[in-house]
Amino acid sequence: GKPCGVIGTLGATLADDVAAASNTTPDAVSLQQQLAQWLAQGVRAVSMEVSSHALEQGRVNGVEFATAIYTNLSHDHLDYHGSMEAYGRAKLRLFASAGLQHAVINADDPFAVQVRAAVVAGAQVVTYSARGAAADVRVVNAQFQAGGVRGELHSPWGVANFFSPLP
């Protein structure tokens, strides 16, 4: 396999090397330093959790994203954004990024329609649903158990059984 860096709430991780973080998404200078360091180490892919704060503050300006994933809006960040509308606008910035090739969108979330409309022209959109919404990838026959959830994933690429220890 090829090395992949991970940046998020738990810090910046590459294999067993973990650097703690004070923010989900580092400030712009620290982020660019981390990406440059990993590039010098041969890393060609990074999975990054990008907060709405970071989008609003320009912390990821200059970063070209190949894929963006939208999960949901919650009330967690209203203290910063002031309204759900402002929070949503901040999230949309990621999907309007030049160079975006793929957008993965939670069709179960009410804001999904606005996200899909904001996706930059030419990007492939894949939707997913755990609640039966019309989507490209759907959870079917979900069975919630004490140890987690199991079910089937139906998609244009086929059907697969899954088990997740997360409820």
Q: PLM features: residue spans?
A:
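Switch II of P-loop NTPase G domains
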Residues: S52-G62
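Short beta-strand-centered segment that lines the nucleotide-binding/catalytic pocket of NTP-utilizing
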Residues: K2-A15, V50-S51
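Short phosphate-binding/catalytic loops that engage adenosine nucleotides
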Residues: K2, V43, A123
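Short acidic, glycine/proline-rich loop/turn micro-motifs
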Residues: D16-A20, S164-P165
